[in-house]
Amino acid sequence: MATFVQKPAEVEKKWILIDAEGLVVGRLASLIANRLRGKHKATYTPHVDDGDNVIVINAEKAVLTGKKYTDKKYYWHTGYPGGIKERTARQIIEGRFPERVIEKAVERMVPRGPLGRRQMKNLRVYAGSNHPHEAQQPTVLDVAKLNNKNTRSA
């Protein structure tokens, strides 16, 4: 019996909606990365984009555990000498684009390269509860029920 190899034309992508309110960012990002890559499917093939389309709402209400909210730093370089910049997770979450915390967490869990970039285009993250993808009829995935560690205990 030969090994099954998924062909790009045979891929069936579903739309999944995840509400990030109260969920831990790292655990959420890990689950999203697996869904984007298609590793939850029996037809997973490493070189084919057979993951699902993922919509994340309420990204601004996702939580970080421990002291990551104040201590975690995101670095980037401008390209100029001495151009290293940093911003804390708190500054990003309280800033204009709080959804970037989840986007960066997922981006760093997906392989770097042409396939990883294509898979990241299947991720849509929104800070609020509104999204323009009602026509796709996404199925709701309740991440909090999958494992009680996925939510922050008070």
UniProtKB/Swiss-Prot annotation:
Gene from which the chain derives: rplM
Cross-referenced PANTHER family: LARGE RIBOSOMAL SUBUNIT PROTEIN UL13M, RIBOSOMAL PROTEIN L13
Keywords per UniProt: Ribonucleoprotein, Ribosomal protein
Molecular function, one GO term: structural constituent of ribosome
A GO BP entry: translation
GO cellular component: cytosolic large ribosomal subunit
InterPro entries: Ribosomal_uL13, Ribosomal_uL13_bac-type, Ribosomal_uL13_sf
Protein name: Large ribosomal subunit protein uL13
Entry-linked Pfam families: Ribosomal_L13
Purpose of the protein: This protein is one of the early assembly proteins of the 50S ribosomal subunit, although it is not seen to bind rRNA by itself. It is important during the early stages of 50S assembly.
Family named by the database record: Belongs to the universal ribosomal protein uL13 family.
Organism: Sinorhizobium medicae (strain WSM419)
